[in-house]
Design a protein with these regions (language model features):
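Transmembrane alpha-helix segments characteristic
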Residues: 100-111, 126, 148-153, 219-241, ...
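Transmembrane-helix signature of polytopic, membrane-embedded enzymes
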Residues: 6-60, 95-97, 278, 282-285
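Perimembrane helix-loop-helix junctions
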Residues: 90-97, 105, 122-153
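Hydrophobic alpha-helical membrane-interfacial segments at the cytosolic entry of transmembrane helices
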Residues: 19-22, 139-165, 208, 212-214, ...
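Extracytoplasmic
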Residues: 276-430
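Membrane-interface alpha helices of multi-pass inner-membrane proteins
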Residues: 67-70, 89, 102-117
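Hydrophobic, aromatic-rich transmembrane alpha-helices
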Residues: 85-93, 126-138, 203-224, 270
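Hydrophobic/aromatic-rich transmembrane helices and adjacent perimembrane loops
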Residues: 1, 76, 121-123, 245-273
Length: 430
């Protein structure tokens, strides 16, 4: 649907193809940091989180949307599956004056806040820009304005009900779900920036960012109005954070970037269409695509070529044993590693998961985290019973993250239920 959106907005299949690739395979200049040596370049394919689109040591954080958003984050995948066709309908509803489409648009987006709140907010801001366009550029008649009113009323009422006890409650509960913060992940808590504001986006987004201004003035008036919704997203996301993790504002910024890719694709295709010699035209486009996409090509290539293992054979064997022999409702005391085989492979409940899961979406499990440390460092039978622990795991993750873990206390009191390599599990109950 992203391609269909681009084709509808730009009026050209060729421009739509370029916009599609600029968005899904576009990247900045992060690849330059890996050209210093063969070893550094090889690290793209062998290192952990060392790619031209995700290299935090140099403040490169504009990740590839396929590898780092759509595949690992189901909410983003589901949200974009609704948002992109919704934007397609918004364009036809507003800019092509097909007012009858408001019903289908409303029906499509009614569940969006429950699927992906950031996509819902992005849609609101783009609709606001399109609504302003309608007021300014079209007759203010009932036939023109009534569909907007019905669309806003239906979505407003349903979305309010959906978000009342979730999004709104979390935003106002004092857990820092909604607060002011400057310049996304480049901004620091003291108000300073890690990099110069413009240099941060130049090296992260690259060619598309450099061409945004000429692309905006080259665009047609309706395309500029649509991009105005993207600018509203950018301004809001640069000053307001909507969740405890500042980084997650990128789910808004990528929609601004999507609209920018449309304009830049149109600009590049129109520029090179003026080059009469086809070989030079092709060479120019290929050079632009290389500059704009090389980082993402390396990032995606890394996924196919990297050969490190997430779990060892011992981890898999332990997970199989747990799956076959542990009660389905058993609770395990483990480290909070997001790769813990008990949870990620065997699917059993654990006391405390990684903070990278839902903690940054407003679920506060500080008590569970503190209990995890106490049960490893200062274990107590009463405290074990209080948290309903059935099994306790000791492995390399436990000893590396909890330095004072007291395995001897468990070994003296409970039977060794499982042992494999460096992993041992003690059974607490029964």
């Amino acid at each position: 649907m992203m391609w269909q959106l681009a084709r509808q907005v730009l009026g050209s299949a060729g421009k739509a193809c370029l916009a599609f690739w600029l968005f899904f395979m576009g990247s900045g200049f992060g690849f330059v940091y890996f050209l210093s040596s063969a070893e550094a370049f090889a690290g793209i394919f062998t290192g952990f989180y060392t790619t031209p689109t995700n290299y935090t040591a140099e403040n490169i954080v504009w990740v590839n949307p396929i590898v780092d958003l759509l595949i690992p984050q189901r909410a983003t995948l589901f949200g974009w599956c609704v948002l992109f066709p919704a934007l397609y309908l918004v364009w036809r509803f507003c800019m092509e004056e097909e007012t009858r489409l408001w019903r289908y648009l409303a029906l499509l987006v009614l569940p969006l806040p429950l699927m992906h709140t950031h996509s819902a907010l992005a849609l609101v801001l783009i609709c606001l820009a399109c609504g302003v366009y309608t007021l300014v550029c079209r007759p203010r008649t009932k036939a023109v304005l009534a569909p907007w009113g019905w669309f806003a009323l239906v979505c407003g009422v349903v979305w309010l009900v959906e978000m009342w006890n979730t999004v709104f409650a979390q935003s106002l509960d004092g857990q820092h779900m909604l607060r002011l913060h400057l310049n996304w992940i480049n901004g620091q808590d003291d108000g300073t920036l890690k990099d110069n504001y413009f240099w941060f986006y130049i090296k992260n987004i690259g060619l598309v960012y450099l061409l945004l201004i000429p692309a905006f003035f080259h665009a047609k008036p309706k395309q500029r109005w649509l991009y105005g919704g993207g600018l509203a997203i950018l301004v809001l996301a640069e000053f307001v954070v909507f969740q405890p993790n500042n980084y997650d504002n990128n789910k808004l910024l990528y929609i601004w970037h999507l609209l920018g890719c449309l304009l830049v694709a149109s600009l590049l295709m129109d520029w090179f269409s003026k080059v009469r010699a086809i070989p030079w035209r092709a060479l120019g486009l290929c050079l632009c695509c290389f500059i704009a996409m090389f980082g993402s090509v390396l990032t995606v290539g890394r996924e196919a070529l990297s050969d490190y293992w997430q779990w060892s054979a011992d981890d898999i064997a332990m997970a199989d044993y747990i799956d076959d022999n542990a009660e389905t409702d058993a609770v395990f005391l483990t480290s909070d590693s997001h790769l813990c085989p008990v949870f990620s492979l065997a699917g059993r409940r654990i006391l405390c998961g990684s903070g990278s899961f839902v903690y940054y979406h407003g679920m506060n499990y500080t008590a569970e985290c503190n209990a995890m440390h106490q049960l490893y460092e200062n274990p107590d039978e009463v405290f074990l019973a209080q948290w309903g622990i059935d099994y306790v795991l000791f492995d390399s993750y436990v000893f590396s993250n909890i330095q004072n873990a007291d395995e001897s206390w468990y070994a003296a009191r409970y039977p060794l239920w499982y042992e494999n390599g460096g992993s041992r599990i003690y059974k607490i109950n029964g």
